Amino acid sequence: MAHQSLYRAYRPQSFRDVRGQEQVTGALREEIKAGKVGHAYLFAGSRGLGKTSVARIFAQELKVSDKDLYEIDAASHNSVEDIRSLNENVHTLPFGSPYKFYILDEAHMLSKGAWNAFLKTLEEPPAHAIFVLATTELSKVPDTVQSRCQVFEFRKPSREGLTKLIDAVAKEEGYTLAPGVDDLVALLADGS
């Protein structure tokens, strides 16, 4: 059996598995339950808090297939041409899902021209398109974009919550931690 890093092995697979972001997962669950899902979301918070994982789970809960899920690294695809290509793609119908779901990771890295090219699509998206913009630097996302999104701020989980998670993972992996090690790891993890 190949070794798998712990962050991959214990990545949340459902909203229930997400720790410390109940304000986000609860709101998204309610939207799904009410059938009132928006077209644009902005997930903001420091690295390692689960923004991309929650976006993937959100897509999964909306029954979006892999063929209709687009993950775009905006740090390396941040040009006007990249966004124009996305704008063209968004207007084609989904393959078999109710939605085409776009995750733009590191969205704050888009160029000014790219933001301008994206704004029209964000203002008047097709009914089958959902966008999740994930950022570690909310202040770099233009106000005109923020105002068109539902903004969710991801918070660092409590040290106590992280300590419990560390204990559970250690137990699952067959390790016994020396007293205080779980708290030290939680402190050094700084919320992620």
Where does each model-flagged region fall?
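Aromatic/hydrophobic pocket-lining residues that form π-stacking "cages" and hydrophobic walls in ligand
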Residues: 55, 166, 185
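Short loop-to-helix capping motifs
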Residues: 21, 191-192
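A short helix-loop-helix "switch/interaction" segment in the helical subdomain of ASCE P-loop NTPases
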Residues: 171, 180-191
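P-loop/Walker A NTP-binding region and its immediately flanking N-terminal helices
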Residues: 1-151, 160-161, 169, 179
